[in-house]
């Protein structure tokens, strides 16, 4: 979260976070469910706060910094419908807020032996790969071909700016993949919705 202090937009969002949280708690009739002295969970793009709904059932309130992926995450979760991903209970486009099924933040796929984790991960990849349907929100998802072309432009400069942290051959191999996927993706007629950040720490267990 500290990275948002580096620019004006990020600082403005951090300053507004308390108000955004208070507004969602009121609008969705939620109570904080934090253990005394503990902090909300924070990640690369936002915070997640454990809450209780009006009927006492547990949930998680996620508020993300407004960026392209955060703006369409609610559409992906709605499409998955709680199968292979946490269920979306409610969302607010203006604040990039979502009320989610609460998973067990203390149990991730990173805790599972690698051979077993690979089987679970592969099953999730297949389960979450969905073909488009006529709903208009599909047009809001970024195409991996465009992302690959973007990386082709950005990776060399980033690699140089970061002090060339790995060998040039590895950079060139990554660029080759990006350039190939960009070209192939533009010609493909078989689009699928995929999870683009499915590392083991992002695969959490359901309670119980």
Annotate each language-model stretch with its function:
Residues 52-59, 206-208:
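Active-site beta-strand-loop-beta-strand hairpin of nuclease catalytic cores
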Residues 1-36:
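Juxta-kinase regulatory segment immediately upstream of eukaryotic protein kinase catalytic domains
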Residues 201-203:
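Hydrophobic residue at the +6 position relative to the catalytic HRD Asp in the kinase catalytic loop
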Residues 13-25, 133-196, 206-207:
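An alpha-helical support segment within catalytic cores of ATP-dependent transferases
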Residues 37-42:
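Protein kinase glycine-rich loop
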Residues 45-51:
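ATP phosphate-binding glycine-rich loop
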Residues 18, 44, 55-99, 107-128:
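A conserved alpha-helical element in kinase catalytic cores
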């Amino acid at each position: 979260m500290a990275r948002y202090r580096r620019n004006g937009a990020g600082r403005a969002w951090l300053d507004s976070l308390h108000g955004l949280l208070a507004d969602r708690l009121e609008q969705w009739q939620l109570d904080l469910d934090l253990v005394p002295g503990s902090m909300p969970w924070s990640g690369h793009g936002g915070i997640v706060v454990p809450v209780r709904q009006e009927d006492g059932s547990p949930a998680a309130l996620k508020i993300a910094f407004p960026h392209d992926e955060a703006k369409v995450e609610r559409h992906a979760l709605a499409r998955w419908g709680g199968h292979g991903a946490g269920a979306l209970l409610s969302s607010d486009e203006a604040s990039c807020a979502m009320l989610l099924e609460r998973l067990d933040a203390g149990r991730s796929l990173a805790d599972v032996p690698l051979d077993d984790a690979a089987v679970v991960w592969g099953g999730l990849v297949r389960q979450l790969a969905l073909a488009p349907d006529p709903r208009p929100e599909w047009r809001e998802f970024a195409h991996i071909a465009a992302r690959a072309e973007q990386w082709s432009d950005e990776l060399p400069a980033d690699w140089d700016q970061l002090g060339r942290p790995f060998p040039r051959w590895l950079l060139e191999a990554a660029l080759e993949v990006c350039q190939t996927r960009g070209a192939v993706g533009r010609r493909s007629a078989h689009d699928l919705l995929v999870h683009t950040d499915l590392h083991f720490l992002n695969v959490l267990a359901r309670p119980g």
